[in-house]
Amino acid sequence: MTDDTKKPGPDADVAEEFVDPAQAGEEQAETAEPDPVELLKAENADLRDKFLRLAAEMDNLRRRTERDVKDAKAYSLAGFARDMLAVSDNLRRALEAIPDELKTNGEAGLNGLIEGVEMTERSMLSTLERHGVKKIDAEGQKFDPNFHQAMFEVPNTAVPNNTVLQVIQAGFTIGDRVLRPAMVGVAKGGPKAEPSASAEPGTSSLNEKDA
């Protein structure tokens, strides 16, 4: 090989100085700083997502707080209401202990006393009802262990089996909870009861007397 072949020609310098424009653009793109507008957009999207999450959490907290306050208000009276129902039961027992003859032919003083006791009972139950305590309408309903407590069974083929025939002590609810179940006697031996349309028995006015 001669010395001429070893020496780089003029074209070699040009080749070394030549840079591919596409490659140069890629290198510039890699080294270029991020677009501030895109950074702001990404930051704004992140802040918006955090705000929406925080707003949802605050709304859930507000709903829970309102529900807790409502429940506390409704059920804080449960113990007091239960005690008042015991007083009402005693008034009812006192009235039922009076013979019918005395009620019919009793003296004016006795009749006035009976009317006073009945008025006191109605007033007490009416006051409890205004505070959310409602009487369970049990008689004639299908027995429901969630609302009724069976005390005895009565053979009766004229009504569907497990129908409440008699209420020994009225039951009550407060809000959506059972304050005390109704003590009842249920039918036995009749046809099978049809499924009830509603799982929850109705309620009636507290001013109605126990069956």
From Swiss-Prot:
Task of the protein: Participates actively in the response to hyperosmotic and heat shock by preventing the aggregation of stress-denatured proteins, in association with DnaK and GrpE. It is the nucleotide exchange factor for DnaK and may function as a thermosensor. Unfolded proteins bind initially to DnaJ; upon interaction with the DnaJ-bound protein, DnaK hydrolyzes its bound ATP, resulting in the formation of a stable complex. GrpE releases ADP from DnaK; ATP binding to DnaK triggers the release of the substrate protein, thus completing the reaction cycle.
Positions of region (Disordered): 1-37, 187-211
Compartments where located: Cytoplasm
Annotated protein name in UniProt: Protein GrpE
UniProt KW Methyltransferase keyword: no
Keyword Cytoplasm: yes
Cysteines joined through disulfide linkages: none
GO molecular function: adenyl-nucleotide exchange factor activity; protein homodimerization activity; protein-folding chaperone binding; unfolded protein binding
